[in-house]
Amino acid sequence: MKIYHIPAAPPLYTNTFLLVGENGLAAAVDPAAGAQEYLRLLEQEGARLTHILLTHGHYDHVGAVEELQRKTGAKVWLAPQDACGGELFPFTTPDNAYADGEEIRVDTDLAFRVIATPGHSAGSVCLLCGGLLFSGDTLFAGDVGRTDLPGGSWDTLRKSLKKLCAAVTENVQVLPGHEEFSTMDRERANNRYLQF
């Protein structure tokens, strides 16, 4: 498996990712804006985008979805709670809804386990892929996602963080939706929001 970090330009500053499996099947995680870089990397790898996996539906995580879907035929995964449309949630029609705990297999060496983590938004999920945790806006390095936006709830996020810590016991790399990367061990030790 190969992974490409594609940071979105200002003002979004979203961490987005393209993962390519050994047989050339690929997944995009939170393609924020500008489909061109994804398409260039897919061509460079001789890969085919089959999955677009969204950690939640906020505008700064979905900007390239429509163009990527149109140009590649990839299917979109998103929790139905976040497919509602509006200012913060552009209308994104998912082809598939997440089920908590399900495995989404993209290629023989590329699979994601879904961990439902509502709180930042009603439909937020984290995606565990081997030693990588795509945490969206649920967990950041030293911080957590805000809960003052529509669909957000601090009480729900706290429960989700406890669940996440219980579900991810190994020291995986945390790849959040914004800012720097971290590890679960570092977050357990230093993130005040994970001190239960």
Give residue ranges: language-model regions:
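Conserved beta-strand hairpin/beta-sheet module of binuclear metal-dependent hydrolase folds
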Residues: 1-45, 126-136
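Short beta-strand or tight-loop elements
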Residues: 2, 108-113
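Hydrophobic residues at beta-strand termini and immediately following loops
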Residues: 6, 98, 117
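Active-site HxH/HxHxD metal-binding segment of metal-dependent hydrolases
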Residues: 12, 33-110, 192-193
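The start of beta-strands in P-loop NTPase/AAA+ ATPase cores
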Residues: 25, 49-51, 74, 131-132, ...
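Residue in the alpha/beta-hydrolase core beta-strand immediately N-terminal to the catalytic nucleophile
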Residues: 27, 53, 115-116
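Hydrophobic residues in well-ordered beta-strands that form the structural core
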Residues: 29, 76-80, 135, 176
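Metallo-beta-lactamase
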Residues: 88, 92, 111, 116, ...
